[in-house]
């Protein structure tokens, strides 16, 4: 089967999420904003304490914090942090003694997240421009890695999970919500950059997704379905035909695993 042109994909994803940053009230394949966050399980009282601009740009596919179980003083990395809602939410959970680093490769998203977090006085949050396949962070520097609706956008998911293992301390948690499929996607979908950017074309089969996590040095503690629906008819049709859906995954880095890759 043919594969997606990575350069075209990267350009399309950056274009899509630049628009999300600049026009959060625009029309997209996916739902956004506070109503989505509350339906997925976010605490309304804590949402009230977050920057409104970050909440209105939220485009996640699940509630990772029920799995992450963050506690005061922990170090967290958010892969694909967007405009920063999850990173800011995590900052309130880990407190002033903790630290949250958000990673995103869209410059407009990073700039917006920095402005919003600074205005909210969240000094324990930092946003770095970078790729989730090459996380700009040192080895074994985090207690938990979170990600929400982003890994499906990567053309190299095994590398993402290897990088997550690298930055986690032994016994650290990987708590993610993402898009997977029950059946293989046809070639025309896999090669469609628009459908990748809409969080459909890059959906891995669920069993392949789980195997990639395990191969990176994690023990999968559980996988759960999320209540999530697409907006556009084209996206809904693909979802219905191939079983494209949102799931949440909790995995724990093996105590003996040190991950692979570089240190920064």
Where are these regions (language model features)?
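C-terminal lobe and adjacent flexible extensions of AdoMet/dcAdoMet transferase-like proteins
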Residues: 18-23, 212, 216-264
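N-terminal auxiliary segments of SAM/dcSAM-dependent transferases
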Residues: 1-40
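Conserved SAM/SAH-binding beta-strand->alpha-helix loop
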Residues: 106-108
